[in-house]
Amino acid sequence: MSSRRMNRFIFIVAGCCSVLTGCMKWDYDLGREIAVRPEVGHGLFITNEGNFQYGNATLSFYDTQTRKIDNEVFFRANDQKLGDVAQSMTMYGGLGWIVVNNSHVIFAIDPVTFKEVGRITNLTSPRYIHFLSDEKAYVTQIWDNRIFIVNPKRFEITGYIDCPGMTMETGSTEQMVQYGKYVYVNCWSYQNRLLKIDTETDKVVDELVVGIQPTSLVMDKYDKMWTITDGGYEGSPYGHEAPSLYRIDAATFRIEKQLNSNFGNGPGGGRH
């Protein structure tokens, strides 16, 4: 089954993110029988991020036909905890790819059995994965001024994209969308930019300044990108402003519309 069809059939709900770093040990235990066995087209994966540094992230599965939910399916299928801060999950190539931020790992699982089929390790603090092909994907990071290039087939890191204007301490790249050969990414923590990456050269070729801390990035069916800023927080060394919503044309990489909000009305209430 193609990745596009798989994306239509199985959807994912992700919890909000933690932005600190740390480490944890892989923990194994006896699993329990899993009642729900998903059929393609009848399910919803839910990543539960857990508490930072508690290593209690979990994966749930909701069957949309029976309206039954099974919790901790990764743990029960693999006799292993998912890790510390489940940041996001993406379907591609018939597999579910779970990005576990504070465990520095991405798990690939069979979406029917929930069994692990591979993992990408030695990541700094991964946030999201975007697939360019069966053998190439980008992984965004926080506390790193690079986007990692990985080979999903071999579960290996193959290279890096240097992001301008960042250090390892201030590095922050988040969600990615693609238009033609270009991938766009929002830079969130202590940042105010979107980056444009040429996927043929793996280089940043342009950037666009928006408001303080753009938290997310999506593309609509009209090839318009949308990003919303949280405006930072009071007392932040990077500044504090009211949140805004931006519409950006993907072809020209220019802001077409800016909708300003009030303090306290942005993502997370506009403050941290």
Residues of each region from the PLM?
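C-terminal motif of bacterial Sec signal peptides marking the signal peptidase cleavage site
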Residues: 19-22
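Bacterial N-terminal signal peptides that target proteins for export
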Residues: 2-10
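Sec-dependent N-terminal signal peptides
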Residues: 9-17
